[in-house]
């Protein structure tokens, strides 16, 4: 079975400080995982390496079996690999669906484009409705 996300031999140093070394990680689709450890253990660095915010010194990041190591963070987002930060907030004045539409729009590269075609808007809304249903979120 293809893993949703894998790292193979991932390593990153900042000067003489080796933050990650030979990290092998396999994450199954739909499973929940926790990355825990003390401050300074390299958790954020590992997430930044996987998301493309940092380039590894060695190793690979695989998304559904495809090597995305050389892709920018923006390209990884378009392929479905994105990260959230510890402090994340929804737009409180928007509905659940409207919040999901913003996220889907960003991933599809359709955000904040007033001149995009109507069918692209419909595609974004349709996908957002599906995601909202999968997550069993009610609108308010």
Give the location of each predicted region.
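Short coil-to-beta microelement around the adenine-binding A-loop and adjacent beta1/P-loop entry
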Residues: 17-18, 75
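The feature captures the beta-strand-to-loop junction immediately N-terminal to the Walker
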Residues: 36-38
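Short beta-strand immediately N-terminal to the Walker A/P-loop
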Residues: 33-34, 83
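Short coil-to-helix segment of the ABC ATPase nucleotide-binding domain corresponding to the Q-loop/switch region
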Residues: 94-110
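ABC ATPase NBD Q-loop/coupling interface
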Residues: 60-79, 115-121
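Helix-to-loop junction immediately C-terminal to a conserved catalytic motif
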Residues: 51
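Conserved ABC ATPase "signature" region
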Residues: 112-140
């Amino acid at each position: 079975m293809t893993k949703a996300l894998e790292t193979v031999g991932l390593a990153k140093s900042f000067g003489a400080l080796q933050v990650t070394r030979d990290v092998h990680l396999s994450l199954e689709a739909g499973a929940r995982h926790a990355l825990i450890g003390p401050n300074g253990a390299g958790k954020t660095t590992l997430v930044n390496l996987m998301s493309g915010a940092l380039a590894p010194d060695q190793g690979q990041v695989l998304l559904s079996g495809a090597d995305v190591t050389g892709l920018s963070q923006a390209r990884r987002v378009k392929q479905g690999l994105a990260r959230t930060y510890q402090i994340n907030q929804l737009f409180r004045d928007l509905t659940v669906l409207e919040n999901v539409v913003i996220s889907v729009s960003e991933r599809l590269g359709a955000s904040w484009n007033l001149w995009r075609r109507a069918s692209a808007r419909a595609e974004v809304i349709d996908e957002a409705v599906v995601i909202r249903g999968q997550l069993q979120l009610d609108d308010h």
